[in-house]
């Protein structure tokens, strides 16, 4: 490729990036029992290149953040009461897994072991007992937020460490996205700013969500603080606060979802309060120069229409600038109301801190986006092809269909 801005160095705060292609967080729900697994090490190490920035998949700030009920979250198990596959870890340091050789590469047998591990996991979801043998397709269940990784206890910190070390060994920088699910997943009692879910139930929320009390909101903010602290203990270079895609912080922003009449509802400032509090707490805990924030103000995920998305975004960007947050990760909307298409720009729009944009599927399109000085993120491309950065260098990226599937080391 001729001289491209995508491959030019970029200084982001105290971080020196070799190029402007960032590995976006992609939820995979393969961390059985919320414990990072051996295949996570291989997955991220494959995608790490010198001077690159990777952002790990959304990691829950608490057991309740997975979408569990308040009572269950208080003393709930870290994993479901079903047998785990051989090699999956519950409170065991990942370095004990004998298929990892030097923490970065794996032998051919090790790769196959990891692939078999993942295959076992998916097969175990085909029946109710959790046994891979004799699975019946009729009992298939979709990946669950319960299988998202977490960052709320010491065991998870220890499980993340070798994964972070593997990424650092490749010369890359590694952030972790921290997240609270809210009402999105199908669970017993998801939490929400509101009382009901549009007056009925559907496949997204089979039970009525539980309204959060003020004290519980304060605790959630504290959970974000602790998760950020734990991420640094695990070796991450920073965290990204997930305030997008219809999850809890995003739910508070949307007037169609947030019907509260207290200090967390009503005005734009009130609806953004929990997000602002979380940003402030995390910045205070680990330093604002280690904090990014993900927003999707125009997206209407999970029936969460917004009447004032631009006002919400501008308010939050102003707060980020005041705190000195490292970057703002804005997602290109794929779910949006028709009237928001081509929405006019605010005449005095404040510039977001170090803008990062996700949802730019082709490197030529991304090249146009990063010329003003931001970075482009690619999550889905890297999910399928860990070498996407190397492909751009010669200017001959493979077509989207040419990806490695069964058999190769990329299948994790």
From Swiss-Prot:
Keywords: Fatty acid biosynthesis, Fatty acid metabolism, Flavoprotein, FMN, Lipid biosynthesis, Lipid metabolism, NADP, Oxidoreductase, Oxylipin biosynthesis. Pfam families: Oxidored_FMN (PF00724). InterPro entries: Aldolase_TIM, OxRdtase_FMN_N, Oye-like. GO terms for molecular function: FMN binding; oxidoreductase activity. Its EC number is 1.3.1.-. Belongs to the NADH:flavin oxidoreductase/NADH oxidase family. This is Putative 12-oxophytodienoate reductase 9. The lineage of its organism: Eukaryota, Viridiplantae, Streptophyta, Embryophyta, Tracheophyta.
